[in-house]
């Protein structure tokens, strides 16, 4: 039940009508052919599996991911789209279900459809980390390693997901949420 409330909360925060402002000051509608999926959760969503060479090749350019963190060494800039070559969550993570979700989507959708994903995940974290009401209190009680991962999202993974979703919404349409939550909330 708590998961449903959190997912509903995400949708309510994101479903406000938002057009983008063109340089000429006019409204530009988001591209209805750009489908965006918000992805969050624990270690498997973060990318716990090893990335092999085959995972880095053949990614259709219609499958893109938005960087959720800045990483100068890896060349990542938060809020920018890139072809969805793994890793998705952070530069030091692995293969996620998102990698093949996006590939399957573009393989089975018309060529006019582009798929974008935004992944914000922290292994071992409770769903409380993605609840705006409990995130800060939950994180205070966690070990330093988890705080370090969360710090890459400015200490609030929920807020980062919402921030990036609002950026993405200016270009496309949020079509769904992928949540992979496991051992901490079973």
Give, region by region, the residue ranges found by the protein language model.
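Positively charged n-region of N-terminal signal peptides that target proteins for export
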Residues: 1-4
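Sec/Tat signal peptide C-region and signal peptidase I cleavage site
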Residues: 18-21
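Cell-envelope and extracellular/periplasmic
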Residues: 23-186
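General helical structural elements
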Residues: 6-7, 66
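Bacterial N-terminal signal peptides
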Residues: 7-15
